[in-house]
Every structure is written in structure tokens, then in C-alpha cells.
Regions:
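Hydrophobic residues within membrane-embedded alpha helices
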Residues: 11-12, 228
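Binuclear metal-dependent hydrolase catalytic cores
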Residues: 2-9, 15-190, 199, 256-276
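Cap/insert and terminal regions of metallo-dependent hydrolase folds
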Residues: 195-276
């Protein structure tokens, strides 16, 4: 895609033309857990792998149309994740929950504020956590140069629009912590889920593409699904294709691990783009 150089009066920034004619494009910016892959101090085959699909930054994603760009979570690898991406305005930043691996890169959205304030959406608990953890971003008189963020508290099932994309929050449980997944038409994005209440399931009817967390093959975890649980959940809601994210090095080498999954279930990897 050809890029054009434009000069902003306040900042010199590189812009990219929108994604004309491509519909919605979903990019996996990161597919790893809080440790990422490779894991510091680990010398397993996955952590030593030269296959880029085995290298996983912290979980984050990008949903784009020709007119709109939405980022889901801004973890500590956000700057590195966005460097290969065209420089476009961020129309909305959706936060799933307050844990550091999902919000640690909030400050790195600053360059995008040259293109306009960024609207940030999260549940009330996460909004309070953001104000506490990043107070300099949300004061009445912010220091010059801090990110220009407008914080919005959102509720499960209450739809809203970001540009031309309709967003519906879905509540899931991260252990004992209520967090948000998001539905965009026939696409659902859910990470860090362990369980979901039955009353949430009707809001996932008709999902064709599911992105959902799957920590590892075995050894039960108190707040994350295993791969088997993620597949069971996919079957329960009737998704046509499922991409697993928030993965540890314990899944094994991508090339080999993928062969163990059903034909309609895929291990996502950093940089993977899908059309939805």
C-alpha cells in the first residue's frame, strides 16, 4: 500500500491512506500472555524458535475499516506493535481490563494524539484503575505533552458507535474479576476469560469469527481458559472459525501445535490479519 508524506503544522507525521475496499480488517498485534514469548530465562524449543509465529508480544488487536481504526488494549509492547502499522488516527481505544499487560502502554499512544484526542472505553472498574495508575493523563490541568485521552465508562450490552463500527461490550469473568469482551457484528473478541454467565450467551448468537483466549493445553488455571475450554466455548456459541490468543510457550511450536487443533480452530500469531 503506497504511503504519502504529509506535514502537520504542529508535528511532522507520516500518514497512510485508508483501507479502501477491504471491509473490516482485524490484525493481531500481540498474542502472548503477560510474560510474552520468549519467556525471560527459558531455553525451551519454543522460546528458542526462529519461526516468527512462535514470538508473541502481549495481547492486543487492531480493527480497521476505510474510515475507522479501533485498538483493543494498549499493553507494554504497544509501541513495538504499532511501528510496522501505517500511521493513522486512532478513533477508539477499547480496554478489556486493568491488568498491566493490557494497559501498560497507554502512554505510548501519545504520537497518535497529534491526529486528535483518543476516546478510551472501559467498564467503571477499569476507568477508576486508569485514573489511579495514570493520573497525569486524566487531570483537569494536564502537563503539556501527555496523551490526550477522553475516558468513557461503558456497560455490558449497551451498543455504541466508533466511526462506522458498532461495538457491543460483553461481560466475562477473569477469575473473580468482571471484564469486557467486545462484539463487532459477526466478530467477537474475548481475552482473559475463565467463565461466562449463561445470560451473556444470547449476545453472542450469530458470531461467525471468534477470537478467544487459550492459555495452554493442560494444568488448570484459576483465571484463564485452557485450549480445550476455549474450543468447548467456541462450539457452545456456534462460531464458524475460531482464533486462539493470549497463548503461553506451553502450547508448543506453532507449526506442530496447529496440527492438533480442529480444522476450524487456529492459533493466532503476531501480525496475522483476517478479513471479517
Amino acid at each position: 500500500m503506497k504511503q504519502e508524506e504529509l506535514i502537520n503544522n504542529e508535528h511532522s507525521v507520516r500518514h497512510s491512506p485508508p483501507l479502501e475496499g477491504l471491509g473490516e480488517v482485524f490484525t493481531f498485534l500481540g498474542t502472548g500472555t503477560s510474560n510474552g514469548v520468549p519467556v525471560l530465562g527459558c531455553s525451551c524449543d519454543v522460546c528458542k524458535s526462529k519461526d516468527p509465529r512462535d514470538n508473541r508480544l502481549r495481547t492486543s488487536a487492531l480493527l480497521e475499516t476505510a474510515k475507522t481504526r479501533i485498538v483493543i488494549d494498549s499493553g507494554p509492547d504497544f509501541r513495538q506493535q504499532m511501528l510496522p502499522q501505517p500511521f493513522r488516527k486512532i478513533d477508539g481505544l477499547l480496554i478489556t481490563h486493568i491488568h498491566y499487560d493490557h494497559v501498560g502502554g497507554i502512554d505510548d499512544v501519545r504520537p497518535y494524539c497529534a491526529l486528535g484526542d483518543i476516546e478510551v472505553y472501559a467498564n467503571e472498574n477499569t476507568c477508576n484503575g486508569l485514573r489511579h495508575n495514570f493520573p497525569y493523563c486524566f487531570t483537569d490541568n494536564p502537563y503539556p505533552g501527555v496523551p490526550k485521552l477522553n475516558l468513557h465508562s461503558i456497560q455490558p450490552h449497551v451498543k455504541f458507535m466508533i466511526g462506522d463500527i458498532e461495538v457491543m461490550p460483553i461481560e466475562v469473568m477473569h477469575g473473580g474479576l468482571p471484564i469486557l469482551g467486545y462484539r463487532f457484528g459477526k466478530l467477537a473478541y474475548i481475552t482473559d476469560m475463565k467463565t461466562i454467565k449463561d445470560e451473556e450467551l444470547p449476545y453472542l448468537e450469530g458470531i461467525e469469527t471468534l477470537v478467544v483466549n487459550a492459555l495452554r493445553w493442560e494444568r488448570e488455571h484459576h483465571s484463564h481458559q485452557l485450549i480445550s475450554e476455549a474450543i468447548d466455548f467456541s462450539r457452545k456459541i456456534g462460531a464458524k472459525r475460531t482464533y486462539l490468543t493470549h497463548l503461553t510457550h506451553k502450547i508448543g511450536l506453532h507449526e506442530e501445535a496447529q496440527k492438533l487443533l480442529p480444522n476450524d480452530v487456529f492459533f493466532a500469531y503476531d501480525g496475522l490479519k483476517i478479513h471479517v
